[in-house]
Amino acid sequence: MTEDKAQQKPSSTAEPTEPLATLERGPVSQFLADNGFDHQYLGRDAAGVELLEVERDFLLPVCTALYAYGFNYLECQCGYDLGAGQPLVSLYHLIKLADGADRPQEVRVQVKLPRQDPRVPSVYWIWKSADWQERETYDMYGIIFEGHPNLKRILMPEDWIGWPLRKDYITPDFYELQDAY
């Protein structure tokens, strides 16, 4: 019986194990890769939506290709801050609307931008719905959308200093309230 136990013990020498599962590209990422568009596939979120990351210099070519692929609706463009000293992110949630589709295909594209130079090309000329969404992201995070036809503050007063949703934003101690009359 002791011999059986000795044989059942795991060996102390580590045998090579199989590599961890790699991310299998989704159909949108595969389309972009097949057509030579530089991007990084980040996987899928809990809802099963593909998440891609592109460099800011490649945003317009990638978005133009996605529009040609059928992503005809920009559901949401937003920004977020990864934290003090970390990049800002511009995120695009695209949908392929088609007649008779049970569930439209979706993809999210993100661009990380350095805090010191948060510039990215505007996608307004591809999807007109980006107009006010890019303005709001500019107003709250200070991301500059180059080529936007009317990039100005939309929520805060024009003379407001700073970007209120950045994590390094310092809230003023005093707000000057003006009468609405």
UniProtKB/Swiss-Prot annotation:
- Write down the EC number: 7.1.1.-
The superkingdom of the source organism is: Bacteria
Protein's UniProt name: NAD(P)H-quinone oxidoreductase subunit J
Q: Which SUPFAM superfamilies match?
A: Nqo5-like
* Keyword Cytoplasm belongs to the record: no
Tell me, in a sentence or two, what this protein's role is: NDH-1 shuttles electrons from an unknown electron donor, via FMN and iron-sulfur (Fe-S) centers, to quinones in the respiratory and/or the photosynthetic chain. The immediate electron acceptor for the enzyme in this species is believed to be plastoquinone. Couples the redox reaction to proton translocation, and thus conserves the redox energy in a proton gradient. Cyanobacterial NDH-1 also plays a role in inorganic carbon-concentration.
Q: How does it sit in the membrane?
A: Peripheral membrane protein
Record text on subunit structure and interactions: NDH-1 can be composed of about 15 different subunits; different subcomplexes with different compositions have been identified which probably have different functions.
Subcellular location per UniProt equals: Cellular thylakoid membrane
Q: What class of enzyme is it?
A: translocase
Q: Which InterPro entries does the record cross-reference, listed alphabetically? A: NADH_DH_suC, NADH_quin_OxRdtase_su_C/D-like, NADH_UbQ_OxRdtase_30kDa_su, NADH_UbQ_OxRdtase_CS
Ordered alphabetically, the record's keywords are: Membrane, NAD, NADP, Plastoquinone, Quinone, Thylakoid, Translocase, Transport
A GO biological process of this protein is: photosynthesis, light reaction
Source organism? Synechococcus sp. (strain JA-3-3Ab)
- State where it is primarily located: membrane
Sequence similarity:
Belongs to the complex I 30 kDa subunit family.
The UniProt annotation puts the region (Disordered) at 1-20
Task: Give GO MF terms, alphabetically.
Answer: NADH dehydrogenase (ubiquinone) activity; quinone binding
A GO CC annotation recorded here is: plasma membrane-derived thylakoid membrane
Enzymatic reactions: a plastoquinone + NADH + (n+1) H(+)(in) = a plastoquinol + NAD(+) + n H(+)(out); a plastoquinone + NADPH + (n+1) H(+)(in) = a plastoquinol + NADP(+) + n H(+)(out)
